[in-house]
């Protein structure tokens, strides 16, 4: 294992008023561990393999939200990324919920080809997913909406997601309006502009950090007969 430069002293100087230099940024690296990925140890179905990794990430006390994922869409031939939360994984794919009038929803309507990234840095792991997003049924959206905390339900009504907002006060006023309309303890209806997307995967890649940047990358690709597993150069 090679020795990696220690940049924390430089960072402490930068935090106390010094400039964060290019050299300091370039020195920000660490060695990865010895745990590797072998094709023979991977499950035949990548969804099963993902579920196993997700459970392990959820048990890791350093990872705050194991179900957090970076969702990337396309707008005018340019990628747009943001973090959202995975709310269901099944044999069909990965499900998340959002405002159907949001920027991400408008982008999906034009181009449903999306990617997901699960960055489990403390475990030196990543999972990258490519697939096609489609809306889930209204009943599925409703079933999840009623399980949400009351404050989140009201927030879904109050926020015109991705629209311009003149001030924070305007948002708070909208929240108060809907909180009065649907008091805590009452049944809050599912907004017509709110629901879920199912991402049907076509490619799922599992990445494990290794020594000397010789990382393991195992990629499942969907074919007519099922999933094909292959290895990529790091």
What is the meaning of each model-derived region?
Residues 2-234:
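Binding-site signature for planar aromatic cofactors or substrates
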């Amino acid at each position: 294992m090679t020795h990696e430069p220690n940049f924390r002293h430089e960072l402490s100087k930068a935090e106390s008023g010094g400039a964060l230099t290019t050299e300091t940024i370039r020195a920000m690296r660490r060695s990865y561990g010895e745990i590797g990925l072998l094709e023979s140890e991977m499950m035949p179905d990548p969804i099963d393999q993902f579920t196993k990794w997700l459970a392990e990430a959820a048990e890791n006390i350093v990872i705050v939200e194991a179900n957090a994922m970076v969702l990337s869409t396309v707008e005018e031939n340019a990628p747009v990324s943001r973090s959202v939360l995975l709310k269901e994984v099944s044999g069909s794919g990965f499900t998340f919920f959002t405002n159907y009038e949001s920027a991400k929803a408008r982008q999906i309507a034009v181009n449903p080809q999306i990617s997901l990234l699960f960055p489990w840095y403390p475990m030196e792991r990543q999972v990258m997913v490519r697939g096609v997003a489609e809306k889930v049924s209204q009943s599925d959206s409703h079933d999840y909406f009623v399980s949400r905390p009351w404050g989140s339900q009201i927030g879904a009504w109050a926020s015109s997601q991705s629209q311009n907002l003149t001030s924070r006060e305007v948002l708070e006023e909208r929240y108060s309006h809907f909180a009065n309309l649907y008091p805590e303890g009452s049944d809050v209806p599912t907004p017509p502009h709110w629901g879920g997307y199912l991402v049907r995967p076509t490619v799922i890649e599992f990445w494990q950090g290794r020594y000397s940047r010789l990382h393991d990358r195992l990629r499942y690709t969907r074919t007519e007969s099922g999933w094909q597993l292959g290895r990529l150069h790091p």
